[in-house]
Structures are given as structure tokens and as C-alpha cells.
Amino acid sequence: YTQWYTLSLHDALPILHEGPHQFRMNHMPALLVPGMTVTNEPGIYKAGRHGVRTENTMLIVPSQETEFGTYYKFEPLTLCPIDKEAILTDMLSDEEITWFNQYHEKVYNCLSPELNNEEREWLKEVTSPLKR
């Protein structure tokens, strides 16, 4: 059953990493344009020990017009808190802490209206600002 379900689900739904764009060694070049999605998957893996990765699906959206044309940016589609327990703030720049806190603020502002009081309080705690 598990094998059938997995295969059926794979064939029924869009594949998260389908092209035409790909970030890999052997690929066909394709432009990134608004409306496409990519995944942002930073992580670290210690051989034989452990690993951790966060993953967000990002939407490509227009950012600004310049004399060189339109610039794009990535906007997160998946809004999940990032666990602060494993973060060593002394290894982060001020800019990285600002990004992290702005991301968590967005997570809270987008998700909290859909939650009950208990869930909202939990989300408020886990998305509270990261401090040094």
C-alpha cells in the first residue's frame, strides 16, 4: 500500500522540483521569471553525526525597475517558524538576525489570524525576535 500510495501521489501532484529551471550540474538553461517557484534549502551535514536543513518554497516576483531592466526577488510561500534552539547568534551578522526576525514576523502575521488562542500564543513564542 505504501509503495502504491507514494507512486500514485507522485504521479497525481506537481513535482516540487520540476523545471524548466534547475540548479544542478547537467541541465538545460532556463530564465527565472515571475510566477516560477524555487526551493531555498540551506543546511549543514556532519558526516556520520548529524545534519539540519531548513527549506522554503520561494515565489519569484518583480522587485524593482532599473535602467538595466526588471529585477526580481524571492518571496517565501511556505511560512513555518525556524527553530531558534540550534542557532548560535554570535555567528550571525546583524543583517542575518534582521532577516530572521522579519521572516518570523511575517510568519506570525500571516498565520496567527487563522489560529485559536492557545495556538496563537505558541506561535508568538516560537516567532519571537532572535536576540544576541
Residue locations for each model-derived region?
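Charged, cofactor-coupling segments
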Residues: 9-10, 14-132
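Single conserved hydrophobic/aromatic residue that forms the stacking wall/gate
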Residues: 1-11
